[in-house]
Amino acid sequence: MAARSLSGAVKSLCSAASGSLSCSIVLRRSYVATSQNVTAAGLSKGGSTRVMVGKMEQRGLDQEAESAWGPDPVTGYYRPSNRAAEIDPAELRELLLKNKAKSF
């Protein structure tokens, strides 16, 4: 209920001070507004955008190599190539029970 009253207060504040603040930014959720402000502040600093673009491209190339997909040899469906082989829970239980029976 406090959130609703806070929202009403923000709306009335926005209508009162519409000359200096954008209502759309004030009415958005706080995490969205702060992330946009950080991005806008980072891009307004002249030469830092080129460095960031280069780093983003390098990350993209690294991620493509890590997330390569390939056909599964058993089913033929595509899956991540760096994924371990799956084992059926029933088969795993059977293997574990056989090993315990032999140790006695």
Swiss-Prot record:
Induction: Induced by abscisic acid (ABA). Accumulates in roots and, to a lower extent, in leaves during progressive drought in an ABA-dependent manner. Triggered by cold acclimation.
GO cellular-component term (any): mitochondrion
Pfam families reported in the protein's UniProt record: LEA_3a
Protein keywords: Mitochondrion, Transit peptide
Top-rank lineage group of the source organism: Eukaryota
Transit peptide: 1-31
Family label: Belongs to the LEA type 3 family.
Protein name, as recorded: Late embryogenis abundant protein 41
Native organism: Arabidopsis thaliana (Mouse-ear cress)
Gene: LEA41
